[in-house]
Amino acid sequence: MSETELINNDHMALWYDPVSKFVHHKIKKTLPKGAFEEMLSTGADYLEKYGMKKWLSDDSNVVAITKEDSEYGDKIWAPRVIKAGFTYWAVVMPTSAMGNLQVTRFVKEYRERGVTVEVFDSVDAAKTWLNSK
């Protein structure tokens, strides 16, 4: 495995893969205040630093994203990473109904912003797709 760990705690994990050139996050359980922003901001730093265009979101354990976190992603993070060249997003969808509904909305919004987004049931399938890009 060529992924380098950036964050790993009870709530989330974040890696980057310098070989396949993607950032990968996993939300393990409901995030405390500030954690979502920390995870996305750290990932954006690596995306910019290494000229990466791909992101893998393992959101299978997402129950819900807070309004505050959703607004951060929409207003701060998205413009930043799209400007940096973010082009491909692989999403492992949440198993919870509420989480699935929210992430489905995010997928639609990012497609409208010009990002190529595909949804998956497993991390392995998501990685295979990203590696083909």
Task: Please identify what each model-predicted range represents.
Residues 2-133:
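Amphipathic, Lys/Arg-enriched alpha-helical "gate/interface" segment within cytosolic domains
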